[in-house]
Amino acid sequence: MGSKSPEGHNQAPHGAPNALDKPANPAVKAQNGSGSADLDRGTISNDDDDADDDEKETQINGSSNAGRIYLFPSRPAKFQHRPTDTPSTPEKKKKKRKRSKKKAKPTEAKQTSPPRVPLSTLFPSGYPVGELVADDRTSRVTDEETRYNSRLWDDGFLADYRQAAEIHRQVRQYAQRELIKPGATLSSIADGIEDGVRALSGHQGLETGDGLNAGMGFPTGLCVNHVAAHWTPNPGAKEVVLEKSDVLKVDFGVHVNGRIVDSAFTVAFDPVYDNLLEAVKEATNTGIAHAGIDARVSDIGAAIQEVMESYELEIAGKSVPVKAIRNITGHNILRYHIHGGKQVPFIKNNRRDKMEEGEVFAIETFGSTGKGYLDDDFGIYGYGRNEHVPATGLRLASARSLVKTIDANFGSLVFSRRYLERLGVKSYHLAMKNLIDNGIVESYAPLVDVKGSYTAQFEHTILLHSGGKEVISRGDDY
């Protein structure tokens, strides 16, 4: 989820780096390995049978040397030939060896389509690790650094992040296969993604406070063509249908205990836009490659811009350069805050900020065929609670009630009108306006380039530790 550059943009409610965290039965053993194996070899482990056969052989021949009838030991005793003129002694009934029953292997749990199996069921022993990238400069772990990391990251930190990342991977790959197609409505895509996230996290978010345990990190962004960021379907708005000529950005967050994974991708059905998508994807990977402990954000931005703006595409017979969008940035992520206090531009800049050990960053880039600068559009993408403004002195009872609902269910997480109505909140428009007017809640508008242009976005979340970095949201798709 892109962070708009500082010009006229307050980072709160999720921009305060010092904000407080929001709590958030054994088988019988056979002689030769198994009963079935013994039968296959033609041997039955019963010593009395061999002794009986030796006695009968001596009685028939009168001596051990003359006229011996050879009995082949490899042939099972019950199949040996007996003379017809010799009365046979009744054979002992042999007990049939019971074949040991093989224990049924536990059936491996598999994800459904649409995804509805909670991730804790699929991965009872731990969640998949992201892409690990060692840093030669820092790939040593001393006792002091281990203690330092333990202060930064508690015992559940990595497990929470890896769970959130795997939820993101499974849901987005389902969306790419089944949801994102020409003719699909954007509301159906958003609902499909968000239903999947809530199901896999095991938290539907309908009970008070449940959404703070796990679920959506922010509303699903579905931005078409010149709309670059911060657009989501809203109740009562005109339905938007995805066209074959569209370029769609899909940006959504998943959190577990406030640890937010922020990752985004772009889909285009017309190959004319392939170079635009490739430029932005390569730019994001360049940013990830340059990111690390002590890396300067100015160096990262310059490297990203150089790669992205080396691409161009041909539209309607004209060569069009890809421009790095200059007033939206990547950002660090804090617990329950999608935007921390640090920004990572994708253009040359003079910032002196450095990345530090223990930090979490969303490395994202946006490219455009337009002017490469975004303006606020009409409408509202979502809302966020300003934690620095107390909810006191509100005259409207509906406003007091609404802010209690927001604090109890979203805390400092960004939410949308769809999320309020899902909780059964009604007639909230006047109350919301009152909260915004008092600075208690902030609203966020869609961000757009010029009409007729096309924009693309790719984004990953990375964790920085003493051994290097973990691209926690990396998948087979991007």
UniProtKB/Swiss-Prot annotation:
Cotranslationally removes the N-terminal methionine from nascent proteins. The N-terminal methionine is often cleaved when the second residue in the primary sequence is small and uncharged (Met-Ala-, Cys, Gly, Pro, Ser, Thr, or Val). A divalent metal cation 1 binds at residues 251, 262, 459. Binds 2 divalent metal cations per subunit. Has a high-affinity and a low affinity metal-binding site. The true nature of the physiological cofactor is under debate. The enzyme is active with cobalt, zinc, manganese or divalent iron ions. Most likely, methionine aminopeptidases function as mononuclear Fe(2+)-metalloproteases under physiological conditions, and the catalytically relevant metal-binding site has been assigned to the histidine-containing high-affinity site. Residues 1-124 are annotated as: Disordered. It comes from the Eukaryota. Residues 46-56 have a biased composition (Acidic residues). This is Methionine aminopeptidase 2-1. Residues 92-104 have a biased composition (Basic residues). GO terms for molecular function: initiator methionyl aminopeptidase activity; metal ion binding; metalloaminopeptidase activity.
